[in-house]
Curated annotation (Swiss-Prot):
The keyword NADP does not apply. Keywords: Ribonucleoprotein, Ribosomal protein, RNA-binding, rRNA-binding. Gene3D superfamilies: 3.30.420.100. The keyword rRNA-binding applies. One of its GO terms (molecular function) is structural constituent of ribosome. This is one of the proteins that bind and probably mediate the attachment of the 5S RNA into the large ribosomal subunit, where it forms part of the central protuberance. The gene is rplR. One of its GO terms (cellular component) is cytosolic large ribosomal subunit. This is Large ribosomal subunit protein uL18. Pfam families: Ribosomal_L18p. One of its GO terms (biological process) is translation. It comes from Ehrlichia ruminantium (strain Gardel). Part of the 50S ribosomal subunit; part of the 5S rRNA/L5/L18/L25 subcomplex. Contacts the 5S and 23S rRNAs.
Length: 120
């Protein structure tokens, strides 16, 4: 268990170090657990969160039945795209996957958000 957590921490640090080069762009950060999926758009220069969406919202709970799968992640991506469209000039940002590999629901979320016209 200790080796797994160390791998997660190393991967998280490695990803964040690469993202620090793009401080001019906003950061789209994700967190996933066994039951929920969270997304935030963060401005690291001032420490402000502009938009957030998760599987804890009523629209997602009604359709996804409290599971983190491709259907619930697609709904979260749709909610996030609606909230990002309300912001001005927010079509390009950096995708912070944290300690998670780019497979499964992480890749599904990223591809779904790209299909709505966002670049990262």
């Amino acid at each position: 268990m200790l080796a797994t957590s160390n791998r997660f921490e190393r991967r998280k640090r490695r990803v964040r170090l690469k993202l620090k080069n793009n401080l001019s762009l906003l950061r789209l950060s994700i967190f996933k657990s066994n039951r929920h999926f969270y997304v935030q758009l963060i401005d690291d220069s001032c420490g402000k969160t502009y938009a957030a969406a998760s599987t804890l919202e009523r629209e997602v709970i009604a359709l996804a039945h409290r599971r983190v799968n491709s259907n619930s992640v697609k709904i979260v991506a749709k909610l996030m795209s609606e909230r990002l469209n309300k912001l001005d000039n927010c079509k390009k940002f950096v995708f912070d996957r944290g300690p998670y590999k780019y497979i499964g629901v992480v890749a599904e979320f990223a591809n779904e958000l790209r299909s709505y016209g966002f670049e990262f």
